[in-house]
Amino acid sequence: MDLWFSESHTPDVKLSVRTEEQLFVGKSEWQDISVINTPSFGKMLILNGHVLFSDADNFVYNEMVVHVPMAVHPNPEKVLIIGGGDGGVAQVLELYPDIKQIDIVEPDEMLVDVCRQYFPEFASGLDDDRVTIYHQDGLRFLRNCDSDYDIIINDATDPFGHTEGLFTKEFYGNSYRALKEDGIMIYQHGSPFFDEDESAFRSMHRKASQSFPISRVFQAHIPTVPSGYWCFGFASKKYHPIEDFKKEDWKARQLKTDYYSANLHLGAFSLPRYVEDILEEEEEK
């Protein structure tokens, strides 16, 4: 008998993946968590019925949210990850020896334990000496920060449930305050491809643009996200993602990557016309 996992992306569109076995199912204080094994994507982590990542495409997300700001900021030493309980973002950050401190704010302890057991290739990023994990609410943590971080990466899942507060105007304002005078924030911007998702996409850009002097959007192809087209926000107090991109400096590091490259950095900010139109409309409001 064929077993399939299906995630609804819109009332008319689903992602369906053949499943070999269910490896874990549980309910934490914060969310439903399951892990399945699939022939096409390997293991998949599913939260509240939505795919968070898979073995096959998690590298795209992790590399983009890390290498883009790291190739722009001249001397980042302290990084804050909101979410990040799987360890994948931290694992990529650890390629940079000049980073001295990585703080991870992940409220869900069960999620961390599940990732350590079923995704050790990513969770190894949690074991670096520079990493400290705080099991508390991300917005509450930010309220107590003041000019502390060079880079903040909002690795929250989506603007619903217990992470809803991480997509509010208050969150962007608190992130601005938590950054040093030349700090950068990276956040999930979603996809505007489906009409059902466009309003959230607009709202995020509007809030970021109102909170930061520099607000840009970049893109990546991630097969398991809705539409396969995903965007990220680059919000900065000082540095522009293209004008201040240190291409040769980053290439000199000779880091091994599977998705990000210096050439891709430039292309990632060259958005489709319909996406540019949406962003420009929000900036004019």
Curated annotation (Swiss-Prot):
Compartment annotation: Cytoplasm
Source domain of life: Bacteria
UniProt-listed Pfam families: Spermine_synt_N, Spermine_synth
Major place of residence: cytoplasm
Residues covered by the PABS domain: 2-237
Pathway(s) this gene product operates in, as recorded in its UniProt entry: Amine and polyamine biosynthesis; spermidine biosynthesis; spermidine from putrescine: step 1/1
Chain positions recorded as S-methyl-5'-thioadenosine binding sites: 31, 106, 137-138
GO molecular function annotations of the record: spermidine synthase activity
Keyword Transferase in record: yes
Cellular component annotations (GO), alphabetically ordered: cytosol
Catalytic activity: S-adenosyl 3-(methylsulfanyl)propylamine + putrescine = S-methyl-5'-thioadenosine + spermidine + H(+)
Binding site for spermidine: 86
Keywords from the UniProt entry: Cytoplasm, Polyamine biosynthesis, Spermidine biosynthesis, Transferase
Active site: 155
GO biological process, one term: spermidine biosynthetic process
EC code: 2.5.1.16
Enzyme class of the recorded protein, top EC level: transferase
PANTHER family the UniProt entry points to: SPERMIDINE SYNTHASE (PTHR11558:SF11), SPERMIDINE/SPERMINE SYNTHASE (PTHR11558)
HAMAP family, per the entry: Spermidine_synth
Family membership: Belongs to the spermidine/spermine synthase family.
Subunit (UniProt): Homodimer or homotetramer.
Function: Catalyzes the irreversible transfer of a propylamine group from the amino donor S-adenosylmethioninamine (decarboxy-AdoMet) to putrescine (1,4-diaminobutane) to yield spermidine.
Name of the featured protein: Polyamine aminopropyltransferase
Organism: Streptococcus uberis (strain ATCC BAA-854 / 0140J)
